[in-house]
Amino acid sequence: VPPLDADLDLHFRHRIRFGRGLRDAGLDAALRELRGGGGFRANLLPIVDAGLLDARPDFADTLSSHLAALGDDAPAACAPLILPGGEIAKNDPAILETILERLDRERVCRRSVVLVVGGGAVLDVAGYAAAIFHRGVRLVRMPTTTLAQDDAAMGVKNGVNRLGKKNLLGTFAVPEAVVCDLDLLDSLSDRHWNSGFAEAVKIAVIRDRELFERIERDADAVRSRDRDAAEAVIRRSAELHWRHIVEGGDPFELGTSRPLDFGHWAAHRLESMTEHRLTHGEAVSIGIVVDSTVAVLEGRLDETSRDRIASTLASLGLPTWDDAAHDHHELLAGLEEFREHLGGPSGIALPTSIGASVDDARPDVDVVRHALERCATES
């Protein structure tokens, strides 16, 4: 038998919708498309972040009533499953098991729908469960934090933390739709509101000078939760993250670089080192400053741009250093762990100016150590 070779062309549609309120944000339209045909009506399991319910105790009932009102035009909704939010959702194996048991109890099949409403961690673990159950159940994401709406929900990755490592287990799976109800952001504390804008700064620094200048100019308004200022930043950041997935040529990260993880090797390690005392966005903010300093020391970025980046993050109420980072040896282990995750001669993204970057830099560890020392001195 001769060798058999063929290319597989796989087609996915990656839908992002923004609005205010469940209907305006596009939830109804998305679910009607997923109803099922030929006399078959799919079922739907809503999964809701408990953190949202702390601020809006009525939301689970509101969602259930809204889904029921769609009637036969949409999948048949089960009672919501409530999960704890934050990184515990990804750290605790019992939470993943709880989701899988509920999927099994509700007789969820590959034509069913999981609707996950929550922050990035809940989106991750619910998405992972959906991806591995029956080898893939259709997923609709409804992100409820600034970080999830301007970044995390736009990607096609899911995952959980195991063996003390961030996202050690995970999948790539394109959601059926991402529905961003901007009104849900009103439930956030100031700390978690601010935290999400670190990812907007990240994408602006490496991809979009105009967005960076908008954030720099409007930082006080964004921090004070001015709707127009914040929404403009969130929407543009989301679009840039989405465009990287659909136009960047490597949605499933088969290459040797992850430009959207600028600042993240340090961030992931700091989250672990502080036992998640730092939020993801706060850790990313510190990582951005560290890697911008590395870029300066390598002659890639000018000092003024580095200072503007750090100043903008601070103006958004985000940290630019943490005492945990004084343990340089432990923090630098995160760089090696980051490289191991990709495998091969992988590099990191470093800015060359505001709005531009190299995606595959390989700084010497002594340069990175020097950058950490400088950041510590300036803190």
PLM region descriptions:
Residues V1-S112:
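ATP/NTP phosphate-donor binding region
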Residues P2-D9, V48, A198-V201, R300-S379:
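C-terminal charged capping/lid subdomain of soluble metabolic enzymes
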Residues R17, G127-A221:
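A glycine/threonine-rich phosphate-anchoring loop and its flanking beta-alpha core
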Residues G19, P46, P143, D181, ...:
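Residue-level signal for inorganic ion chemistry
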Residues I47-D49, V117, M142:
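Short hydrophobic segments within beta-strands
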Residues P84-G86, V117-G119, G249, F262-G263:
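Glycine-rich beta-strand-to-loop/alpha-helix junction loops that act as flexible
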Residues E106-V140:
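Active-site and donor-binding regions of nucleotide-sugar-utilizing enzymes
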Residues R214-H329:
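Active-site segments that bind and position negatively charged phosphate/pyrophosphate groups
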